[in-house]
A protein has these predicted regions:
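Hydrophobic transmembrane alpha-helices and their immediate loop junctions
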Residues: 1-164
Length: 164
């Protein structure tokens, strides 16, 4: 049972990152690297201008975007690329509702939308803040980061207490 849940999570994670990759390519933002796992690289290959890497620890995944090119895109395209993984997970969860795979997709979408540092929700919030302010502001960005972490923690604690 544990193996099947881990497999569901891994596939949901793969779909999430593929969402970012496909959205970036559709918006002409280079994504030179797609990685599964962390730690030492076990193997990899190049395909279509992307280096696909597989690492020793099968925890997490990432798509490395060309940030300079991403920032040259419109606000709506930046937000689309940053939220594409979450959108894919929500669609997959809806299509497979009531299954472990649906649950893993929903869990992945819910945790990624939180404004926690380096999560998709945080990155999207930063893009929108910078567009709203028309500049970078360290004070505002740190305030958003700290407040986002506090709100996320409060939501998690509230949910945990609610389910006791």
């Amino acid at each position: 049972v544990l193996i099947s849940y881990l497999l569901c999570f891994f596939i949901a994670l793969l779909l999430h990152e593929l969402g970012h990759l496909v959205a970036a390519r559709l918006c002409y933002v280079p994504a030179p690297e797609f990685g599964l796992g962390w730690g030492r690289k076990l193997f990899g290959f190049h395909l279509g201008g992307v280096e696909y890497k597989f690492h020793a620890l099968p925890i997490g995944a990432y798509v490395r975007l060309d940030i300079a090119e991403l920032q040259r895109r419109s606000l709506s395209r930046q937000v689309l690329i940053l939220l594409a993984g979450i959108i894919v997970n929500v669609v997959a969860a809806a299509l497979t509702a009531g299954t472990p795979f649906g649950m893993m997709n929903l869990l992945l979408a819910a945790t990624n939308i939180l404004p926690l540092y380096q999560q998709d929700g945080w990155k999207c919030g930063m893009v929108m803040l910078r567009a709203l302010l028309r500049r970078k502001s360290a004070v505002v960005e740190w305030t958003f980061t700290i407040a986002g972490s506090c709100v996320s923690l409060a939501l998690i604690v509230f949910q945990a207490i609610r389910h006791l």
